[in-house]
């Protein structure tokens, strides 16, 4: 439940920036990819957590979570994808081919002539890959029936993706602390400017790849389109994913920075790892299980609760039978109920009772989850 609630926040973030910068939301189910399995405490914990992620996203490398859903929920139609993944390299694959990054990329392009695949690209020199290797392979990449996804895996995520020189989408001129001035012309191209006798004199852009960031460099090499909201969308043959040190706050910073640079949020995918899904306790979201009601042998009903006088109210628990009802303000808890009260409006459904499971379909769970966004 905790992982599902966290995934929900990532989904809301993706929805928010898609609404601001994109023409459609097709990318959202795949914008946050579950990278957490290798950092979880056990196979079992990765399954439970991964199932929560799959409530809001379909991209996952925690494949056992898909099996878990098939095991614990009613079977989904074979045409219904619970979760998906793609071929992706890691550092030992890249270093096994020697120091020549171009040869490694050529090998991978031969290995995967079609479809989507991801390549970790910072094993040796990330900015060399971005500024030299990829431009040299541009024609091969653009002629593929599929997408090559570039994955940086070190450095400051915001700087790597968005660059270290910030130029706002709606301001034409910005002076940096270094004294340099940059100008964005009408088609979005960044150029250096200097102050002359007749005002600003526009020069060529002298920013380094590091200053531009990955997304802008990919745009310069591969191009793309400008959507109806005025934001740039990379060519469909190239993309980017970042999965190192991603948090909800950092993901928001990246999406905000891309927006300020004039790029749609669909240009980046986040790998959400075990720091997000493992580094939690029952207190992260205040989650606990309590007994609140009992029926004695003679049929008498008793409220079970605690309300310590030495507490500030945090440990005070619900009492009696409880239900959750849907109101105009959202879901609300109703307590102090007895077994004879009306529970027809209770949103909580029995899934396990007295040793018997009452399975539901994963599709219905997805519908409830997404309708609550």
Which residues does each predicted region cover?
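Gly/Ser/Thr/Ala-enriched C-terminal appendages of enzymes
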Residues: 62, 68, 74-76, 97-100, ...
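Buried, small/hydrophobic-residue-enriched core segments of structured protein domains
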Residues: 1-228, 248-250
């Amino acid at each position: 439940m905790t992982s599902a609630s966290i995934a929900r926040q990532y989904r809301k973030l993706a929805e928010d920036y898609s609404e601001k910068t994109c023409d459609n939301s097709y990318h959202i189910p795949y914008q946050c990819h579950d990278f957490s399995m290798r950092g979880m405490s056990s196979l079992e914990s990765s399954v439970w957590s991964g199932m929560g992620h799959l409530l809001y996203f379909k991209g996952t490398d925690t494949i056992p979570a898909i099996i878990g859903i098939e095991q614990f929920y009613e079977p989904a139609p074979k045409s219904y994808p619970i979760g998906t993944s793609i071929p992706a390299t890691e550092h030992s694959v890249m270093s096994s081919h020697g120091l020549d990054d171009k040869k490694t990329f050529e090998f991978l392009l031969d290995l995967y002539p079609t479809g989507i695949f991801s390549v970790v690209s910072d094993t040796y020199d990330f900015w060399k890959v971005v500024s030299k290797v990829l431009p040299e392979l541009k024609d091969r990449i653009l002629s593929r029936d599929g997408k090559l996804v570039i994955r940086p895996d070190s450095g400051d995520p915001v700087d790597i993706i968005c660059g270290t020189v910030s130029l706002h989408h709606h301001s034409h001129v910005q002076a940096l602390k270094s004294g340099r001035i940059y100008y964005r012309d009408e088609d979005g191209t960044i150029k250096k400017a200097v102050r002359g006798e007749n005002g600003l004199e526009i020069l060529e852009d002298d920013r380094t790849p590091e200053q531009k960031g990955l997304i802008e460099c990919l745009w310069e090499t591969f191009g793309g389109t400008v959507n109806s909201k005025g934001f740039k969308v990379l060519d469909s043959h190239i993309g980017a994913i970042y999965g190192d040190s991603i948090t909800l706050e950092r993901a928001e910073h990246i999406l905000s920075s891309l927006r300020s640079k004039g790029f749609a949020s669909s240009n980046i995918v986040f790998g959400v790892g075990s720091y997000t899904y493992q580094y939690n306790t029952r207190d992260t979201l205040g989650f606990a299980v309590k007994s609140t009601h009992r029926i004695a042998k003679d049929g008498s009903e008793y409220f079970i609760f605690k309300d310590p006088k030495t507490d500030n109210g945090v440990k005070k628990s619900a009492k009696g039978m409880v239900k959750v009802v849907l109101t105009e303000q959202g879901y609300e808890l109703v307590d102090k109920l007895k077994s004879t009260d009306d529970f027809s409006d209770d949103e909580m459904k029995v899934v396990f009772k007295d040793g018997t499971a009452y399975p539901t379909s994963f599709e219905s769970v997805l519908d409830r989850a997404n309708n609550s966004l």
